[in-house]
Amino acid sequence: MDTNDAASRLEALGNPTRLSLFRALVKAGHGGLSVGECQQRLAIAQSTLSFHLKALIHAGLVTQERQSRTLICRANFDLMNALVGFLVDECCVEERCRTQASDAA
């Protein structure tokens, strides 16, 4: 993942409704939630849910699968883990380098 990819995904999560929706899908696990369940949990209008789902799907953070007459939404856990990894991958690297340099001196 590069900086532009991470930025676009973080931008999608930067909206409180989308973040709440994504967190609900993460909590639901790999089984996901139906669109109706998402709407009930967030207590938002169908049109509002569709708008925010579209943004999360476009960012690759959510997938949808039709099961008979039900649309199931799932968090993309691989992408979520990659995004978290991108954020923490170099955590405190410069601090460690400074510490190692001062220890060597």
Stretches with model-predicted labels:
Residues M1-D5, R23-K27, F77-A105:
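Amphipathic alpha-helical dimerization/coiled-coil segments
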Residues N4-A45, R66-L79:
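N-terminal helix-turn-helix DNA-binding core of bacterial DNA-binding proteins
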Residues Q40, I57-H58:
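Alpha-helical residues within the helix-turn-helix
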